[in-house]
């Protein structure tokens, strides 16, 4: 009897201990899961973003070293070289000696001291020497840049409703490029754009010499400090993250982002580099102008139908720039010690939303910095071709408000030319000295109402001239002048 009671009490104690062990294990497991979830939310989602890596002078000195090589070149090596390696009878352009185009000669002739007199340091190593010349303030350059940026902002606002040329359509097309956008991101819609109100300030411009094996005597480079702060340059977009498993668009997570530039500062490097290869030429679908032989034949046998193409052919050749000559380029980049501070606002979710997640801001900032460094941070540079600055009639314009003054001057020149030209026409209308012929053409045909190239009317008060002609393609002026109200023919010669 006593043994049965002791056995029952032992079994009961074992059952109670087993139940307690299961309850304790269950509670401990639940508590560990809760702690893990809490730690993940606190340290991963709402944790503070690590500070950006330092871009101080130490990083710049270790990754960006320049060698001032213009003083290391032997002045006795190399003599003056002509523009062509082989002499040619058709080369009438005088050769330019290399000593007149290297960096040392440029600095001497422009009274700019860019390199100190002691370029070598200890142990024969070359140190980075900036200009001993006083840095430029660049106030005038800031005004020009501010005007250019203001014009771009105004133009972008005027074209805001244009479906093809607006900045909104351009950004939307760039952000939704199917070759670069991942498949788990839905269409990106731009909701807000601010082009800012402030302007970058450039200062402390100095010239340094950079070792360049492709240039005789090195290459000159301008360093400009730039700073942009307290501006509202921003862009806001909306998109959705797509979950394509187990089937496409299984879940959609709306995301809204706003990126603003808080401050940007750095050192801008600008240098001129020659073109490595001539630009490619795409043939124009328009008919080609007459050749020189055709022009000679047309000038030798003039007809009413062939006079206008004959006179317009040299003009077309003058207006069109050469297609095979290489152009100079300007290269610009930023030193690695730049500073780009961004402000990223985020809103994730549809009903219960997460606002300003630090991890999202960190990812966006890293992507923006990577995009910027892959394009304009040394050793990568942006190369832009210099525009053609040769004066051409196709680009000639008149400032607003000066039309009347220009017209009066042109009218007076027309009247003087008419008085002087008509007095000589009676005797010389049929003959012309050989030295006054158009270059590349045959004998100059007599002028009449058909052979005039182009004319424009100038109206100043009661005077109106219909015969003022601009300079022809061959360099001569049309001498078929007449005054309204005068007799036709040779009566004006009297």
Swiss-Prot record:
Basic residues composition bias: residue spans: 57-67
Cytoplasmic face residues: 47-494
Ranges facing Lumenal side: 1-25
GO terms (BP aspect): mitochondrial genome maintenance; mitochondrion-endoplasmic reticulum membrane tethering; phospholipid transport; protein insertion into mitochondrial outer membrane
Annotated region described as Disordered, given as residue ranges: 53-99, 278-330, 395-494
Annotated compartments: Endoplasmic reticulum membrane
Residue intervals of the SMP-LTD domain: 134-387
Transmembrane segments: 26-46
Transmembrane recorded as keyword: yes
GO function terms (MF aspect): lipid binding
Coarse class of the protein's main subcellular location: endoplasmic reticulum
Keyword set, alphabetical order: Endoplasmic reticulum, Lipid transport, Lipid-binding, Membrane, Transmembrane, Transmembrane helix, Transport
Main function: Component of the ERMES/MDM complex, which serves as a molecular tether to connect the endoplasmic reticulum (ER) and mitochondria. Components of this complex are involved in the control of mitochondrial shape and protein biogenesis, and function in nonvesicular lipid trafficking between the ER and mitochondria. The mdm12-mmm1 subcomplex functions in the major beta-barrel assembly pathway that is responsible for biogenesis of all outer membrane beta-barrel proteins, and acts in a late step after the SAM complex.
Subunit structure: Homodimer. Component of the ER-mitochondria encounter structure (ERMES) or MDM complex, composed of mmm1, mdm10, mdm12 and mdm34. A mmm1 homodimer associates with one molecule of mdm12 on each side in a pairwise head-to-tail manner, and the SMP-LTD domains of mmm1 and mdm12 generate a continuous hydrophobic tunnel for phospholipid trafficking.
Record protein name field: Maintenance of mitochondrial morphology protein 1
This protein's encoding gene: mmm1
